[in-house]
A protein has these predicted regions:
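Catalytic core of carbohydrate-active enzymes
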Residues: 1-229, 240-244, 255-256, 261-275
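Long, continuous compositionally biased terminal/linker segments
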Residues: 250-252
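Short acidic/polar inter-strand loop motif in beta-rich domains
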Residues: 278-280
Length: 280
C-alpha cells in the first residue's frame, strides 16, 4: 500500500499516470511503443505483467534498457536489452513483478484487516542496485490518510532513500527528506518534510524492520549512523548469487546475491545513513 500511496502522491504533483505504460517510461525506445500489456507502478521501479490467458505458465516481459531486473518474490535476475524474457506466471502463484535495477521500494509486509491498522507497522526496504554503479533511489510519502492536515498543516512524511558509492569498497544507504528538486516540481533544495510536524510526531516510533539488497558483492561490515551521529555495528546475513539453467518458462540464468539486515535500528521518518564495506 505505501508504494501505491506514494505513486498517487507523485501523480497529484506531476499529472503523470499511476500505472505508467512502457512508452512513457522509455519514450526513446520505439520498439516498446506497442507494448500495452505491462506497466510500471509509478516511479517505484516495479514492472508488472499479469497473465491474461487461460492456463498460462509464464509471461514474456519486454525489457527496454541495459539493466538488471530482479524478481520480487524469487530473486531471479533478468536482463535482455530490447528483448523479451520468460517469467513464471502460474495462476496459483504471485503475479510476475520485477524490480528494476536502480530502485528502492519501501513496503509494509504485515497483513492487516485494514490500512488504518498498518499505521504504525514497520517497513522493509527492498533495494535493487543499478548494474554499473551499484546506485539506487526510492521515495516514500505518508500522511494520516483521513484528513486535510497534509495540506493545511504540512503534516506528512516525504522521504528519499539513496544508495551511493562512498569511496572504494564502500556503499552508503541514506534516508533524507525529499525536496522539490527531487520530485521535479521546483528547483528548490528545501526539505518538503517540515521537522516536527504533527504526523512526523505521531509516527515517530515507526522503524525500518528489514533491509534487503540484491546483487551486491560480498559484504564485510555494516554500520548504522543516526541523525545525531551515533554509530552502531549491525549484524546481517549475506547469501552469494548462483548460476542457474534457464527454461522455457523462466529465462533467468542467475539467482541474485541477497543481503539482509534485520532490525537496522533506524526510523522511517528520520535522517540516517548505513555504511557498507563490500568486496572491491
Amino acid at each position: 500500500l505505501p508504494v501505491w500511496y506514494t505513486a498517487f502522491w507523485h501523480s497529484s504533483l506531476n499529472g503523470q499516470p499511476v500505472l505508467k505504460p512502457q512508452a512513457l517510461v522509455f519514450p526513446h525506445d520505439t520498439a516498446g511503443f506497442d507494448v500495452d500489456d505491462q506497466y510500471f507502478l509509478g516511479d517505484s521501479g516495479l514492472l508488472i505483467k499479469p497473465p491474461t490467458t487461460k492456463g498460462a505458465s509464464h509471461v514474456d516481459i519486454y525489457l527496454a534498457d541495459d539493466e538488471d531486473y530482479y524478481h520480487h518474490f524469487t530473486g531471479h535476475v533478468y536482463r535482455a536489452p530490447g528483448g523479451r524474457v520468460a517469467v513464471p506466471a502460474p495462476l496459483s502463484d504471485h503475479v510476475p513483478m520485477l524490480q528494476r535495477g536502480g530502485s528502492v521500494v519501501p513496503m509494509r509486509e504485515r497483513v492487516r484487516r485494514s490500512a488504518e491498522l498498518q499505521r504504525l507497522d514497520p517497513f522493509t526496504l527492498y533495494i535493487a542496485p543499478s548494474h554499473d554503479e551499484l546506485a539506487a533511489e526510492g521515495h516514500l510519502y505518508m500522511d494520516d490518510g483521513q484528513t486535510f492536515a497534509y495540506r493545511d498543516d504540512q503534516a506528512f512524511l516525504a522521504r528519499k532513500f539513496t544508495l551511493t558509492r562512498d569511496g572504494p569498497g564502500h556503499l552508503r544507504l541514506a534516508s533524507t527528506s525529499l525536496t522539490g528538486r527531487d520530485i521535479h516540481t521546483s528547483a528548490s533544495s528545501t526539505a518538503l518534510q517540515v521537522p516536527g510536524n504533527a504526523y512526523e510526531q505521531e509516527t515517530s516510533s515507526v522503524r525500518v524492520e528489514r533491509i534487503i539488497v540484491y546483487g551486491l558483492p560480498e559484504v564485510h561490515r555494516i554500520i548504522a549512523r543516526d541523525a545525531h551521529g551515533h554509530e552502531t555495528s549491525l549484524s546481517f546475513t549475506y547469501t552469494s548469487g548462483t548460476s542457474r539453467s534457464p527454461t522455457a518458462s523462466d529465462a533467468s540464468a542467475r539467482l541474485a546475491s541477497r543481503l539482509e539486515i534485520r532490525d537496522p535500528r533506524v526510523l522511517i521518518g528520520q535522517d540516517w545513513s548505513i555504511l557498507m564495506e563490500i568486496a572491491p
